[in-house]
């Protein structure tokens, strides 16, 4: 049985970009200052206040967004006053996003605006340096994921100092409005988190028009707003983290209820031996949906999410293909108890949904071998949870705490050295030195 915990990894990240895992992270936009993209934790959905609203009436998250919008440099051939108003309206649309993650970059510092003020384009950059020190043989890789904690500990790797610029990246944002599409946004993001944390990797590429989103985007099954902020890039291990090519419809009714559903191109992770069993190509789209109730202008919400998928394998003993239905269910919430205090919670369970989770996506757990019958695979059960809180000491200094666990339930107890469950605990402290420059540390 493998029990994974972390007590001794301290990440300090110095970044021109953002923070992840115990790190001091500085973020920067390629446009001039280091552009930090850390948008505090989970209440971004709510903050559509206008630029005219008094600052003292805004929450700390809304103040951050307003400050970033006010600092945006607009390049236009039209009237400069109108341009500032137009860019504010368009950028509010950028930040009010159900699927926006804490570590996503902020809008580009420089924005080109059309003469009529209905179209804006910006190209931004993000410099993010993460560093860590491990003094008790916790984990042999950059970042932190309990799945990779070695059991037993490796005596040759009991102390480790590391740093990476893998979060550094580029992004392009197109924002606009017209009579046919309504409000629309195109977004492309890539960074150097690919092979060996050096190769360039596409992170997102999607187009949103009105209630529709098409492209490579965050899965509808993931609630990015219900997660505490972490410097660690992986985040709490008991949550979901998945990006798919998808077609999604999302609509909000009377500012209180939101429903969404999507067809997502599948990518299953099946553990087979190639002798008695073999995974088959995916051919049925994953289906994800949620219903959400929100209040406080969207700063708080409760959400129920569901996932259904078809997992196919071949029994090489009898020479026949089989389909197994995989599913997942999730309850998630963000609650703004006070203007400066947020609470987060997520509980996820299911069978055959493991590749959507943070920890179990590190290996092949959607289907595994049946220990009682050769040639058979089955979808094991897994349960995970995330609890968190965030507190703003000032409008620029805030802290997050997170507690999370992922449990894996195969038909038989795993043997020694095999994953059974992982525990995750983290404390993060962030300081927004400017609207586009941030440092942080995590334990």
Positions of PLM-derived features:
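Extracytoplasmic loops and strand-loop junctions of Gram-negative outer membrane beta-barrel proteins
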Residues: 105-109, 150-157, 228-232, 272-274, ...
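Short, flexible, mixed-charge acidic loops at enzyme active sites
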Residues: 137-147, 358-363
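Outer membrane beta-barrel
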Residues: 112-143, 155-268, 283, 288, ...
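Bacterial Sec-dependent N-terminal signal peptides
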Residues: 1-54
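N-terminal periplasmic/intermembrane-space "pro-region" immediately following the signal or transit peptide
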Residues: 18, 46-135
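Detector for outer-membrane/organellar transmembrane beta-barrel domains
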Residues: 293-413
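Transmembrane beta-strand segments that form the barrel wall of outer-membrane beta-barrel proteins
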Residues: 183-194, 263-265, 304-310, 398-411, ...
């Amino acid at each position: 049985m493998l029990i994974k915990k972390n007590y001794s990894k301290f990440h300090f990240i110095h970044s021109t970009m953002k923070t992840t895992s115990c790190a001091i992270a500085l973020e920067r936009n390629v446009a001039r200052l280091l552009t930090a993209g850390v948008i505090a934790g989970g209440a971004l959905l709510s903050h559509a206040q206008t630029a005219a609203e008094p600052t003292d009436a805004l929450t700390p998250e809304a103040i951050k967004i307003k400050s970033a919008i006010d600092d945006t440099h607009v390049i236009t051939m039209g009237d400069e006053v109108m341009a500032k108003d137009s860019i504010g309206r368009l950028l509010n649309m950028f930040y009010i996003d159900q699927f926006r993650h804490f570590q996503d970059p902020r809008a580009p510092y420089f924005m080109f605006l059309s003469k009529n003020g209905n179209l804006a384009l910006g190209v931004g950059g993000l410099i993010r340096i993460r560093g860590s020190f491990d003094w008790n043989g916790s984990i042999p890789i950059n970042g932190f994921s309990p799945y990779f904690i070695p059991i037993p500990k490796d005596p040759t790797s009991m102390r480790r100092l590391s740093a990476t610029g893998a979060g550094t990246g580029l992004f392009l944002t197109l924002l606009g409005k017209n009579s046919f599409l309504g409000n629309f946004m195109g977004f492309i993001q890539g960074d150097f988190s690919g092979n060996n944390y050096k190769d360039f990797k596409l992170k997102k590429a999607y187009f949103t028009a009105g209630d529709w989103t098409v492209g490579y985007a965050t899965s509808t099954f993931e609630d990015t707003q219900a997660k505490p902020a972490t410097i660690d890039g992986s985040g709490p291990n008991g949550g979901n983290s998945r990006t798919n090519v998808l077609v999604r419809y999302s609509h909000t009714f009377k500012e209180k209820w939101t429903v969404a559903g999507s067809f997502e191109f599948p990518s299953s992770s099946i553990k087979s031996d190639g002798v008695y069993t073999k995974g088959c190509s995916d051919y049925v789209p994953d289906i994800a949906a949620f219903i959400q109730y929100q209040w406080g202008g969207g700063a708080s919400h409760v959400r129920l999410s569901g996932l259904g998928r078809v997992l196919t394998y071949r029994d090489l003993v009898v020479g026949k293909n089989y389909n197994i239905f995989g599913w997942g269910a999730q309850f998630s919430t963000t609650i703004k108890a006070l203007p400066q205090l947020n609470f987060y919670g997520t509980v996820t369970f299911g069978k055959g949904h493991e590749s959507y989770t943070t920890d179990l996506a590190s290996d092949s757990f959607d289907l595994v071998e049946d220990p009682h019958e050769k040639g058979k695979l089955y979808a094991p059960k897994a349960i995970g949870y995330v609890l968190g809180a965030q507190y703003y000491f000032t409008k620029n200094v805030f802290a997050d705490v997170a507690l999370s666990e992922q449990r894996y339930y195969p038909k038989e107890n795993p043997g020694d050295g095999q994953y059974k469950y992982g525990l995750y605990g983290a404390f993060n402290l962030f300081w927004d030195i400017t609207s586009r420059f941030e440092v942080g540390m995590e334990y």
